[in-house]
Amino acid sequence: MFGIFKRSTVVRKSEDNFVKSETKWFKGQKVKIKSGTTSTRSFHKKNQRKASRQTWFREKPLPVPEVEKKQMLISYKGGSSKIAILEGATLVEYYSAESKTKSLVGNIYLGKVKNVLPGMEAAFVSFGEEKNGVLYVADVSNSRRNSKIEHLLNKDQEILVQVVKDAMGEKGARLTGQISFPGRYMVLIPNSNTKGISRRLPDEERGRLDKIIRKIKPEGFGVIVRTAAEGVNEASLKSDIDKLIIEWEKVSKNNQGSAPILIHEEPDISVKVIREHLGTNFKKLLIEGGKHFEEIKEYINETSPELNEIIEAYNDELDLFERYHIEDQIKKALDRKVWLPSGGHLIIDRTEALTVIDVNTGKFVGKDSLEQTVYENNLEASEEIARQLRLRDIGGIIVIDFIDMESVKRQEELLNKFKQELAKDKTRTQVFNISRLGLVEMTRKNVSAGLIESFSEECEECNGRGLIINDIFSNNSIEDNLLESDAVVE
């Protein structure tokens, strides 16, 4: 009845939203994005929804801030390999083969399926270690969307798997059937059509590499171009791919025998670290241990001859790590409390579910105002937190309680500063906006045990809880028994 009074809908076209088409880089690949004319009302609604969402750091990595030239130190003393990466005189990353567990990440095995669990959409695979590894349906080599694990795998079936995450605590290693071979400049993925380029590279360089990859990509293989490929010529990239294809052919030929059996083992940890990290931004590579110097030099000469000039043998009487105070910095990295330059401090606590980092002003009293003091302390903390995450190799969910700031502008500046510091980290991170409670939530890819887990044991007294329950209950029961016995005597 009252329909005639219903307000008619007027759709106005926004002149600002003209039709356009542009090519952008997304997840290492070129994509074409079209935007057209839309109504003003829907345009504003879309912007409101967009503003209400959390922003992920992965979408647009900020440029890596300028840092002092890096150094890499490798020591082979004591029958084990130890590697330190320094920015200036500060230790930022540490790797060792002397820890209680050796990383298996990257190793390829012929495994045997022990259990198929449809309820978990996963299978447990025996691959030669004490604990079986877990293989999720999405990681099975021939898996498709909505595939069922029970349709892909059977009990006692032999399957080629690769370790992508070491066993931690009660959890076994995580496995994948989608095998990949990392090289100096490329990652080769057999039986795949994947083509990707590192998002850390500038657009112009990604365009150059994209043209090269279209020419040299082998049929039946996927390739991912790494950050180290920046400025590398076509011949070097082709050589890297050819070496990786040879590795795959060896694995294919050796894929025989009785499972479980190791098929392909990753190289020594020093070679892995050089492969993943060493680049033109390093000013020196010092190697302590005569017989290993020639091996490393030969590897670099084959893969990155332009870095030959930075390699040096260290033969001084004073230990290499002692000269650069590496062990002192490692000991500090195992502490719960971390002091900041101006007197503030961090408290870092690990739990089964996540890592919590609390920021405090401590001895820092500032000069101008409370707001400025808190702001400066938070900026110092953001830089140190990013370094501690790398040094301690902390992964998983991380929650940071910065000191509260009322200024929204300064909150944004703090978050941008933190993201810039994280851009130095090769491990993938995702950062959310500051929550309503003033917390910064983030994740960091968890691949292997961190520094503390590698060089510590669970306390026998408290079973890792960090506290011991008082004996008040047992004492009360003793007193009650004594009182009862006295009553009986009377």
Task: Name every feature range the model reports, one short phrase each.
Residues L104-V116, L379-R390:
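Conserved interaction-surface patches within small, structured recognition/assembly domains
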Residues E121-V125, K131-N132, V163-I189, K195, ...:
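Conserved glycine-centered short motifs in functionally critical loops
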Residues M1-A97, V113, N154-L346, T351, ...:
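OB-fold/S1-family RNA-binding modules
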Residues V92-A97, Y109, F127-G128, G133:
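Conserved P-loop/Walker A NTP-binding site and adjacent catalytic elements of P-loop NTPases
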Residues G106, N146-L160:
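Short nucleic-acid-contacting surface segments enriched for D/E, G, S/T with interspersed K/R
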Residues S96-K100, L110-V113, P118, D139-I149:
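Conserved nucleotide-binding/hydrolysis modules and their immediate coupling elements
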Residues K131-S141, L188, D240:
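A short macromolecule-binding patch
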